[in-house]
């Protein structure tokens, strides 16, 4: 993750005796974005917390990660000037003054902050709606007025959908192992539970890995990669 200001801009501020940066050098407030799929406010908060709790696993300095956490918090609060001053004090470089573009520390190490942390969702999913839908589906499936044939049709439709997911082609998943800083490639179906990747992990020598991280949170073996937000090209961290 990097600095908000260019080297010349940082030098200019220093030459002004530590005066506050001009308006053009102020960090931008978080932009809006549309998550896909939509998440509830609670889910967004959980993922953000998980990221800050595990961000050190992505490399870089823990001290810098702590500073970035404070900088992002200030930006959430609308205090761009204080966030900018903190970034300057830590000698960070932030491309285009946009924290979502990443940050570089004084040693040139890049720190990437995922959208869900660096930006603000344009909309949230409604937990109540999803629960109501589940209740409606349950009532419909238990409707005594439906004939066995109608129930069978519903069952077949669900089965067909599952078959389609299972038949989808395998995709390449890159896993970056923190112990040797190498990338390992496995071929798995992203629509199946991640636990199905056990044999592939053994083949590349990652059978002893205790935890896998993605977007700052621990991957769940009972869920598929697709369910956890993974798309082709994204890298999974292993520890």
Curated annotation (Swiss-Prot):
The modification Phosphoserine is found at residue 160. InterPro entries: DC-UbP/UBTD2_N (IPR032752), DC-UbP/UBTD2_N_sf (IPR038169), Ubiquitin-like_domsf (IPR029071), UBTD1/2 (IPR039869). The keyword Lyase does not apply. Residues 129-155 are annotated as: Disordered. SUPFAM superfamilies: Ubiquitin-like. The keyword Mitochondrion does not apply. Keywords: Phosphoprotein. Pfam families: UBD (PF16455). It comes from the Eukaryota. This is Uncharacterized protein PB2B4.07.
